[in-house]
Amino acid sequence: QEGIFQTIYPPALESLAKKYRPNSADITGASVEELEKELMKGNPSIVWVTAYCRNPEMGYWYEGTPDQLWVAKNLHVTTLTGFDEDYYYLTDPGIGKLKIKKSQFKYVYDTIGKKAVVVR
């Protein structure tokens, strides 16, 4: 075990998002096509991927949990704000704006577990 694993999961973030945008929802399990449909309606999604959408470094986490968790050591939560034919666009307060190939985003998003909260 190296370092500290910290994150927020979709149910907790959904509760917070609803305080500001009442129609926000935990859409964990949504496909990338469903995320695109939300974007076409003007709704960004907060997504669980990795920093810069690099390949996930998966491993087990034990401390502080009753069971072992299978998580990405390089997990990162960011906002999906747009797409075109070839790319997804992410906006991250710590990293800035990113343009990620659709195939790479889908691979990372799917591997992490398709976790997302749509902001409506």
Which residues does each predicted region cover?
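Structural motif
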Residues: P44, I46-W48, V77-T78
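Beta-hairpin (beta-strand-turn-beta-strand) motif
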Residues: G29, T50-Y52
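Noncatalytic regulatory segments and standalone regulatory/sensor domains
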Residues: M40, C53-A72, T79-R120
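Cysteine-nucleophile protease catalytic domains, especially the papain-like/related folds used
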Residues: Q1-P44, V117-R120
